[in-house]
């Protein structure tokens, strides 16, 4: 472009007309030649200025082109990065279980039983700004969705989740370290999931807050379209126990939770190497019999979760009440069978654990623990429920194994019922082996 402009300028200069007096009067040759030289000098100066301006324009154009190329590269990189973040990751686990118990003569005579536990699938990821989390569990005797929700991070601190999501209550996310959870789990007060919407404020300025509204339980409430209301992962109220009902019977009077509000507040303290969360939780909702409102229910808890070096101490005090006229015992359902709990009771749990990193071949971590739980002051006048679990969990690559020795009274899965009246302490030695992918 620069050479073309130079040729055009020189051509223009060459086409300048000589003064008419130059040809007519030879005597004026000297003065006319001087004038022409002056004009040529001015023209050269103009050409030089134009060339300088042209060079500047070319440099500006080159810089603009480079900036546009850089911007395109950045945008392409952002698109690749966003595309890499999008998508759903599939994981899961396969678990087997060995148990040796004091309450089954057949089990003792066989030297214990080794059974298939579960196969589960987990979905986790995002598409655009929408998060997705789900887990479905396949047992020999049932299939259950543990959780399934979509989420959105609508501010730096706040996230909303909608679907089957965890009820914010007590020490989070678990109030236990062992395979059997704590006594609260069998009351529906630990690792419980219902269908609704949850707002989570992440830890900031030393405090966090969870607020939730659950329309009903994860199976659709009292009239959900399911084969059995006991086919679920977490314990929920499924009925009222009437006179003549057995502890493990299908409930003669079905009930379902609905319109439940739940909140959990945690404040985090740090004192040297000691880190503690102090919290309070509460929930309140209604019970429906399929035709009309049958009553109300509520629960609250004080809890703490402390870490000091490799030690972890969890404490929790809880109370709950199901307020239905003339009813002192409720039916609950989970894991394909029904059980009973008192309509009102108090619970206390104490959990201590020690985590030990190791390098023993594939074994990378051990956690030793003792978890103790007690349910007392029961409205149905049944005896206390007690469970103590002493054990160790072992992490080795994709394998995670629990070794638990359980001693319990009136405890589900340990030879009793949460509304039982036994004075015997039962024992269960349990090994749960899981491969996680």
Region locations from a protein language model:
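Residue-level detector of the transmembrane beta-barrel scaffold of outer-membrane proteins
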Residues: 89-93, 131-133, 159-161, 208-210, ...
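N-terminal periplasmic/intermembrane-space "pro-region" immediately following the signal or transit peptide
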Residues: 22-95, 437
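Signature for the C-terminal beta-barrel architecture of outer-membrane proteins
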Residues: 142, 153-160, 190-350, 354-358, ...
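Outer membrane beta-barrel
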Residues: 79-221, 225, 266-272, 349-351, ...
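Gram-negative bacterial Sec-dependent N-terminal signal peptides
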Residues: 1-22
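Extracellular loop and loop/strand-boundary signature of outer-membrane beta-barrel proteins
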Residues: 105-109, 135-136, 180-185, 247-251, ...
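Outer-membrane beta-barrel pore domains and translocons
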Residues: 95-99, 137-139, 165-167, 214-216, ...
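Outer-membrane beta-barrel "beta-signal"
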Residues: 350, 423-437
């Amino acid at each position: 472009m620069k050479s073309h402009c130079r040729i055009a300028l020189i051509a223009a200069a060459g086409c300048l007309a000589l003064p008419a007096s130059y040809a007519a009067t030879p005597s004026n040759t000297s003065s006319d030649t001087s004038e022409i030289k002056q004009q040529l000098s001015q023209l050269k100066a103009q050409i030089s200025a134009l060339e300088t301006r042209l060079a500047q324009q070319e440099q500006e154009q080159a810089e603009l082109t480079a900036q546009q190329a850089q911007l395109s590269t950045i945008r392409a990189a952002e698109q690749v990065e966003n595309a890499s973040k999008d998508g759903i990751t599939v994981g899961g686990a396969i678990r087997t279980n060995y148990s040796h118990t004091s309450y089954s003569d057949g089990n003792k005579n066989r030297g214990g039983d080794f059974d298939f536990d579960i196969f589960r699938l987990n979905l986790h990821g995002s598409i655009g700004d929408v998060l997705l989390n789900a887990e479905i569990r396949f047992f020999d005797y049932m299939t259950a969705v543990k959780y399934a929700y979509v989420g959105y991070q609508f501010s730096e601190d706040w996230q909303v989740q909608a679907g089957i999501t965890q009820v914010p209550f007590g020490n989070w996310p678990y109030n236990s370290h062992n395979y059997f959870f704590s006594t609260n789990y069998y009351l529906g007060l630990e690792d419980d999931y219902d269908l609704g919407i949850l707002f989570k404020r992440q830890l900031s300025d030393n405090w966090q807050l969870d607020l939730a509204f659950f329309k009903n339980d994860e199976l659709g409430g009292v009239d959900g379209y399911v084969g059995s209301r006991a086919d679920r992962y977490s314990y929920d109220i499924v009925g009222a126990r009437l006179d003549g009902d057995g502890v493990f019977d299908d409930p003669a009077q079905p009930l379902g939770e609905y319109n439940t509000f739940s909140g959990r507040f945690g404040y985090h303290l740090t004192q040297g190497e000691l880190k503690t969360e102090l919290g309070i939780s509460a929930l309140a909702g209604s019970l429906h019999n399929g035709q009309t409102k049958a009553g109300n229910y509520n629960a609250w808890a004080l809890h703490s979760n402390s870490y000091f070096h490799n030690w972890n101490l969890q404490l929790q005090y809880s109370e709950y009440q199901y307020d239905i006229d003339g009813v002192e015992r409720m039916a609950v359902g989970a894991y394909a069978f029904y059980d009973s709990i008192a309509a009102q009771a108090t619970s206390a749990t104490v959990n201590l654990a020690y985590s030990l990193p190791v390098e023993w071949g594939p074994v990378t971590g051990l956690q030793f623990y003792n978890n103790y739980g007690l349910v007392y002051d029961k409205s149905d006048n049944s005896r206390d429920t007690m469970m103590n679990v002493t054990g160790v969990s072992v992490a080795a690559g994709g394998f995670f194994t629990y070794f638990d020795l359980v001693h319990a009274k009136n405890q589900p899965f340990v030879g009793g019922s949460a509304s039982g009246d036994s004075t015997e302490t039962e024992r269960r030695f349990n090994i749960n082996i899981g491969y996680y992918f």
